[in-house]
Amino acid sequence: MKILFTFLLWAVCALLAQARDYVITDYGAKSDTSAVCTAVLQQCIDLCSTNGGGRVVIPAGDYKTGSIVLRSNVHLHLELGATLYGSTDLRDYHRMTTSYKSLRTHTPTIQLIYADSVDNVVIDGYGTIDGQGRVFPKRSWNDEGITRPHLLRFVQSRNITVKDVTLRNSGCWMQHYLACDRVRISGIRVTNRNNYNNDALDLDGCHDVIVSDVLADSDDDGITLKSTSPRLCEDITIQNCIVSSHCNAVKLGTETNGGFRNIVIRGIVVKPSADQSSRFFGRPIGTSALSLEIVDGGTMENVTVSDLSVEGTESPIFVRLGHRGRGWTFSQSGAEAFVAQSLSGGNEGVTRSQKPDSVETVGRIRSIYINHVRVKNAGNYGCSITGLPDHPVEDVHVSDVSIHHRGGVKEADLNAINKALQDEKAAEYPEATMWGPLPARGFYVRHARGVSFDRVETTTEAPDVRPELVQEDVE
């Protein structure tokens, strides 16, 4: 009995220790953005983790920080009325390295909040994290995370929860989850429209993820799955989100070295941003609502998309198997040149050795199911499902889709439209608008096998001479 009592007392004490709050103002942080409170924040995080876990609490007020590193069993809680600003001085950002190898980790990276190989971490509350990312200029085509910080980055971590917080104004991608397992993201509000490469959310080679009830407004892509290493994105659900994007609202790609398997996308509302005061990429009404891409090798399979409500976008649905062939490894000299070019801001004279190694194998897209999609006020590009000669897209099933768009294509336009399609553009960056308006007002299908349509209808605002469906090299 005494042994049992001792054990229970130990367990209660352990739980109490884990539940402890570390309020940053108790450790010297002040609501004052004239100076950073990085050291205090990091002290609280380290103490919390060392003592078995608990909450690091940011109370109401305005605070400024440079890079902080999260630890296992830490719950970062932002109270209502709390705003944590990122420093606008790059000297306050630490260059971080990781043992995980991917296209995005060959060089040290900078981010406001970073975690590597952690377990059981939570970021939540009704406060705000603001990266103040507009002050970091784009210096070269590959400077994301090198001269412009991510706001939030998790690498090879497990049991991650991000809930209810507002995230805004990152220097590049807002959130990058790389090779993470068991991630839950819900109820967050993301505004990222102040710089180039302003994605709202990037899941990269992650497993067992649920993204739900997210409100996202981004200049670049909205909710994006990537694969910048051989590790697939697998067993991921994206549901009940509202997304505004000048580019692709929901996207699988562009990096696809591993690929995507068992992906569910449902209950998504896509609409143009109410704020059109600035634009770095894309189109005011968005480029696409749904982009499914394999262009760097890899396989996409078992993707189910349902219940999309779309306002705008130039080309609502884009399925593309291409062969850009960008790998995830570098020669050593190439990696050094890659970061040196980014830091110098130079774009000229980039040689092949400065770019990632090539992928020789064309990837694969198969078993895609798209159902119950409603589109209104779209552009007149049309939708497309395209592979390459001898590399068809396979088993794509589209049902219960209605699209209303601008229309207006005339007989005199068809020659130019068909001429543009003579170029397969196999190695080009995939974009739903890459060929211009398509030969079909509804769906253009090329190099495909086992594609089916059921209850698909396209109507146009202005008369449009194109047929609803055009298929080439289709079995």
List each language-model region with its residue ranges.
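Bacterial N-terminal signal peptides
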Residues: 5-14
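Extracellular/periplasmic carbohydrate-active domains that bind, remodel
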Residues: 16-475
